[in-house]
Amino acid sequence: MFIKVLGSAAGGGFPQWNCNCANCQGLRDGTIQAAPRTQSSIIVSDNGKEWVLCNASPDISQQIAHTPELNKAGVLRGTHIGGIILTDSQIDHTTGLLSLREGCPHQVWCTPEVHEDLSTGFPVFTMLRHWNGGLVHHPIAPQQPFTVDACPDLQFTAVPIASNAPPYSPYRDRPLPGHNVALFIENRRNGQTLFYAPGLGEPDETLLPWLQKADCLLIDGTVWQDDELQAAGVGRNTGRDMGHLALGDEHGMMALLASLPAKRKILIHINNTNPILNKQSPQRQALTQQGIEVSWDGMAITLQDTAC
């Protein structure tokens, strides 16, 4: 299995365009050791030629321009994106669909709950019908494996996770199980597995078996502490309000990852306020000591027979 991180930041990217928090200003003036990041999305493949896009960030055009694997040479117009899977209906995971309109029709897999949000509150499915048929919806059901024709050796399973519906959704603060899913992806040729969850609130007993059998975790690293936005003076929401489990809290993401056997544990969807963006921060060093990696834009991951 081949995985490439197109974008590793949370909504707004890093630096965020209107933010002068310590991280954003530090990156701009060169006083911290950090790198710019676009908003969260990845591609996966069973052969390194045809790819499935998992979430379409607002930065998708820039991300594709920096990903030669997706350029389909020899045709006037084309792409090696053979399908799109959405894990939720959040703005930072779906706005990029609008930028892909010239390539419609696109085959899009998502739950009925996500499709409802994207047909009403943020109606991209409706808007894009005028572009060569727009987005073709393939419903996915929780814990029911499915495949995408472009990558037939990859089996995807949507796993419901505790998070939140987007602010525009009528289900905000009362999400249904299909509003947020992780993806458990298995290469049926060699059995290697990836668990992808860019947004994860509170893990429960039903989620743990999926986490425990994954060879590689690509998982929510949004905030270091639950009140991070408040402490930085840039917002009122807590990590929990937004549907994200804080890394450094007593029973947070680091503690969860320490209990799991995955060969690699990699963080994605990192907010601009998170101190782990600074490679020299104590928080980043704490991750390194526990063998937890921080993804970056363009990071390539290969899952082979014996290791990932």
From Swiss-Prot:
HAMAP family: PQQ_syn_PqqB
Gene: pqqB
Taxon lineage: Bacteria, Pseudomonadati, Pseudomonadota, Gammaproteobacteria, Enterobacterales
Function per UniProt: May be involved in the transport of PQQ or its precursor to the periplasm.
InterPro entries associated with the record: Metallo-B-lactamas, PQQ_synth_PqqB, RibonucZ/Hydroxyglut_hydro
Pathway participation: Cofactor biosynthesis; pyrroloquinoline quinone biosynthesis
Biological processes annotated in GO: pyrroloquinoline quinone biosynthetic process
Similarity comment: family membership: Belongs to the PqqB family.
Protein name, UniProt field: Coenzyme PQQ synthesis protein B
Protein source organism: Klebsiella pneumoniae
Keywords associated with the record: PQQ biosynthesis, Transport
